[in-house]
Protein backbone atom coordinates (compact mmCIF):
# COMPACT_ATOMS: atom_id res chain seq x y z
CA UNK A 1 0.00 0.00 0.00
CA UNK A 2 2.91 2.35 0.68
CA UNK A 3 4.03 2.05 -2.94
CA UNK A 4 0.60 3.14 -4.16
CA UNK A 5 0.61 6.13 -1.78
CA UNK A 6 4.00 7.16 -3.19
CA UNK A 7 2.74 6.87 -6.77
CA UNK A 8 -0.38 8.89 -5.97
CA UNK A 9 1.81 11.50 -4.24
CA UNK A 10 4.07 11.85 -7.27
CA UNK A 11 1.09 12.17 -9.60
CA UNK A 12 -0.49 14.77 -7.30
CA UNK A 13 2.79 16.71 -7.19
CA UNK A 14 2.84 16.94 -10.97
CA UNK A 15 -0.82 17.92 -11.24
CA UNK A 16 -0.65 20.42 -8.36
CA UNK A 17 2.25 22.23 -10.00
CA UNK A 18 0.15 22.63 -13.14
CA UNK A 19 -3.02 23.64 -11.27
CA UNK A 20 -1.29 26.23 -9.08
CA UNK A 21 0.66 27.82 -11.92
CA UNK A 22 -2.12 27.86 -14.53
CA UNK A 23 -5.53 27.73 -12.86
CA UNK A 24 -5.19 29.72 -9.62
CA UNK A 25 -5.85 33.40 -10.35
CA UNK A 26 -5.49 34.68 -6.77
CA UNK A 27 -2.92 37.53 -6.75
CA UNK A 28 -1.67 36.38 -3.32
CA UNK A 29 -0.40 33.14 -4.87
CA UNK A 30 2.89 34.10 -6.48
CA UNK A 31 5.88 31.97 -7.37
CA UNK A 32 5.08 28.63 -5.76
CA UNK A 33 7.00 25.40 -6.22
CA UNK A 34 5.51 22.12 -5.05
CA UNK A 35 8.50 20.31 -3.57
CA UNK A 36 6.81 17.18 -2.22
CA UNK A 37 3.45 15.55 -1.54
CA UNK A 38 3.06 13.02 1.28
CA UNK A 39 -0.07 10.88 1.05
CA UNK A 40 -1.29 8.76 3.96
CA UNK A 41 -1.43 4.99 3.50
CA UNK A 42 -5.23 5.00 3.18
CA UNK A 43 -5.05 7.81 0.56
CA UNK A 44 -7.32 10.06 2.65
CA UNK A 45 -4.89 12.86 3.58
CA UNK A 46 -2.30 14.62 1.42
CA UNK A 47 0.24 17.06 2.85
CA UNK A 48 1.63 19.34 0.15
CA UNK A 49 5.04 20.88 0.83
CA UNK A 50 5.65 24.15 -1.00
CA UNK A 51 8.47 26.60 -1.50
CA UNK A 52 7.61 30.26 -2.06
CA UNK A 53 9.80 32.98 -3.51
CA UNK A 54 9.59 36.11 -1.34
CA UNK A 55 9.67 37.36 2.23
CA UNK A 56 7.71 36.04 5.21
CA UNK A 57 4.68 38.23 4.50
CA UNK A 58 4.46 36.97 0.92
CA UNK A 59 4.79 33.40 2.15
CA UNK A 60 1.93 33.83 4.61
CA UNK A 61 -0.25 35.50 1.96
CA UNK A 62 0.47 32.65 -0.45
CA UNK A 63 -0.51 30.10 2.19
CA UNK A 64 -3.77 32.00 2.82
CA UNK A 65 -4.50 32.13 -0.91
CA UNK A 66 -3.89 28.40 -1.30
CA UNK A 67 -6.06 27.65 1.73
CA UNK A 68 -8.85 29.72 0.17
CA UNK A 69 -8.52 27.79 -3.12
CA UNK A 70 -8.27 24.37 -1.41
CA UNK A 71 -11.75 23.26 -2.52
CA UNK A 72 -11.10 24.21 -6.14
CA UNK A 73 -7.69 22.50 -6.10
CA UNK A 74 -9.19 19.35 -4.61
CA UNK A 75 -11.92 19.22 -7.26
CA UNK A 76 -9.32 19.67 -10.02
CA UNK A 77 -7.24 16.83 -8.55
CA UNK A 78 -10.39 14.67 -8.43
CA UNK A 79 -10.99 15.26 -12.14
CA UNK A 80 -7.39 14.57 -13.15
CA UNK A 81 -6.58 11.55 -10.97
CA UNK A 82 -8.92 8.56 -10.77
CA UNK A 83 -9.37 7.77 -7.09
CA UNK A 84 -12.37 6.55 -5.16
CA UNK A 85 -12.09 9.55 -2.83
CA UNK A 86 -9.93 12.60 -3.39
CA UNK A 87 -7.57 13.17 -0.42
CA UNK A 88 -8.00 16.11 1.94
CA UNK A 89 -5.22 18.58 1.12
CA UNK A 90 -3.16 20.64 3.56
CA UNK A 91 -0.33 22.99 2.62
CA UNK A 92 2.92 23.43 4.56
CA UNK A 93 6.17 25.24 3.92
CA UNK A 94 9.11 23.04 3.00
CA UNK A 95 11.76 23.83 5.59
CA UNK A 96 14.28 21.38 4.13
CA UNK A 97 15.45 23.87 1.48
CA UNK A 98 16.44 26.46 4.08
CA UNK A 99 17.98 23.74 6.22
CA UNK A 100 20.05 22.49 3.28
CA UNK A 101 21.20 26.03 2.48
CA UNK A 102 22.28 26.54 6.10
CA UNK A 103 24.30 23.31 6.08
CA UNK A 104 25.91 24.32 2.79
CA UNK A 105 26.90 27.70 4.26
CA UNK A 106 28.39 26.06 7.36
CA UNK A 107 30.41 23.63 5.23
CA UNK A 108 31.81 26.52 3.16
CA UNK A 109 32.83 28.34 6.35
CA UNK A 110 34.58 25.24 7.67
CA UNK A 111 36.34 24.81 4.33
CA UNK A 112 37.57 28.43 4.40
CA UNK A 113 38.88 28.07 7.96
CA UNK A 114 40.71 24.88 6.99
CA UNK A 115 42.46 26.65 4.11
CA UNK A 116 43.51 29.56 6.34
CA UNK A 117 45.22 27.22 8.82
CA UNK A 118 47.32 25.59 6.11
UniProtKB/Swiss-Prot annotation:
Q: What is this protein called?
A: Ribosome-binding factor A
Q: Which family does it belong to?
A: Belongs to the RbfA family.
- On the tree of life, the source organism's domain of life is Bacteria
* Gene Ontology molecular-function annotations: ribosomal small subunit binding
Q: Which Gene3D superfamilies match?
A: 3.30.300.20
Assigned keywords, A-Z? Cytoplasm, Ribosome biogenesis
Q: Could you give the subunit structure recorded for this chain?
A: Monomer. Binds 30S ribosomal subunits, but not 50S ribosomal subunits or 70S ribosomes.
Q: Tell me the NCBIfam families matching this sequence.
A: rbfA (TIGR00082)
Q: Does the keyword Cytoplasm apply?
A: yes
Q: Which gene encodes it?
A: rbfA
List, alphabetically, the HAMAP family matched: RbfA (MF_00003)
Q: What does this protein do?
A: One of several proteins that assist in the late maturation steps of the functional core of the 30S ribosomal subunit. Associates with free 30S ribosomal subunits (but not with 30S subunits that are part of 70S ribosomes or polysomes). Required for efficient processing of 16S rRNA. May interact with the 5'-terminal helix region of 16S rRNA.
Q: Primary place of residence? A: cytoplasm
Name one cellular component (GO) term: cytosol
Q: Where in the cell is it found?
A: Cytoplasm
GO biological process: what's one of them? maturation of SSU-rRNA
A Pfam entry, by short name? RBFA
